[in-house]
């Protein structure tokens, strides 16, 4: 699975003009299931995201996790994280997981974060969503579950 993680002061996702997920301080996580992801990819990625130390401590160093600060997580599915732009001008998405399994892994990721005690809001898989955020820092981190055993 791939994730683009943004430290936010606030974030919100809307579908057809209605807010379906909103958080205050915490993380906005755009997530994509990749073809061939193992069954435990969602849980492993969730554990890494929950412990990622990108919030400031008393010494103004990035040394605290979203769990440490009592923050929340907004999880939004985004298959375009699988974009292959190596050739041509139009990205390919063949490395993204098929929608049915992709949605299952996306939901497992959100549930795994909840199981770790985090408040989690979500977008709507496959919907045309509008995401607004205030990126705090800005801090934006790319994470791929395949990068770590």
Swiss-Prot record:
A Pfam family: Tyr_Deacylase
Gene Ontology molecular function terms on file: D-tyrosyl-tRNA(Tyr) deacylase activity; Gly-tRNA(Ala) deacylase activity; Ser(Gly)-tRNA(Ala) hydrolase activity; tRNA binding
Keywords for the protein's UniProt record, in alphabetical order: Cytoplasm, Hydrolase, RNA-binding, tRNA-binding
Main location, first listed in the record: cytoplasm
InterPro entries documented for this protein: Daa-tRNA_deacyls_DTD, DTD-like_sf
EC number(s) from the headed UniProt entry: 3.1.1.96
Location(s) in or outside the cell: Cytoplasm
GO biological process terms, semicolon-separated: D-amino acid catabolic process
Motif (Gly-cisPro motif, important for rejection of L-amino acids): 137-138
UniProt catalytic activity: glycyl-tRNA(Ala) + H2O = tRNA(Ala) + glycine + H(+); a D-aminoacyl-tRNA + H2O = a tRNA + a D-alpha-amino acid + H(+)
Uppermost EC category: hydrolase
Annotated Gene Ontology cellular component terms: cytoplasm
Domain remark text: A Gly-cisPro motif from one monomer fits into the active site of the other monomer to allow specific chiral rejection of L-amino acids.
Complex formation: Homodimer.
NCBIfam families on file: D-aminoacyl-tRNA deacylase
Function of the protein: An aminoacyl-tRNA editing enzyme that deacylates mischarged D-aminoacyl-tRNAs. Also deacylates mischarged glycyl-tRNA(Ala), protecting cells against glycine mischarging by AlaRS. Acts via tRNA-based rather than protein-based catalysis; rejects L-amino acids rather than detecting D-amino acids in the active site. By recycling D-aminoacyl-tRNA to D-amino acids and free tRNA molecules, this enzyme counteracts the toxicity associated with the formation of D-aminoacyl-tRNA entities in vivo and helps enforce protein L-homochirality.
Family indicated by similarity: Belongs to the DTD family.
Protein name: D-aminoacyl-tRNA deacylase
Protein species of origin: Paracoccus denitrificans (strain Pd 1222)
């Amino acid at each position: 699975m791939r994730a683009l993680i943004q430290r936010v002061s606030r974030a919100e996702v809307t579908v057809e003009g209605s807010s379906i997920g909103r958080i205050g301080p915490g993380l906005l996580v755009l997530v994509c299931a990749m073809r061939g992801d193992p069954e435990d990819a969602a849980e492993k990625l969730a554990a890494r995201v929950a412990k990622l130390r990108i919030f400031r401590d008393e010494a103004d160093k990035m040394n605290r996790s979203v769990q440490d600060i009592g923050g929340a997580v907004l999880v939004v599915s985004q298959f375009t994280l699988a974009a292959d732009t190596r050739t041509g001008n139009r990205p390919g998405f063949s490395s993204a997981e098929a929608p049915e399994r992709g949605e299952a892994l996306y939901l497992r990721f959100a549930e795994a974060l909840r199981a770790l005690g985090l408040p989690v809001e979500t977008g709507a898989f496959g919907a045309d969503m509008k995401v607004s955020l205030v990126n705090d820092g800005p801090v934006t981190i790319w994470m791929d579950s395949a990068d770590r055993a």
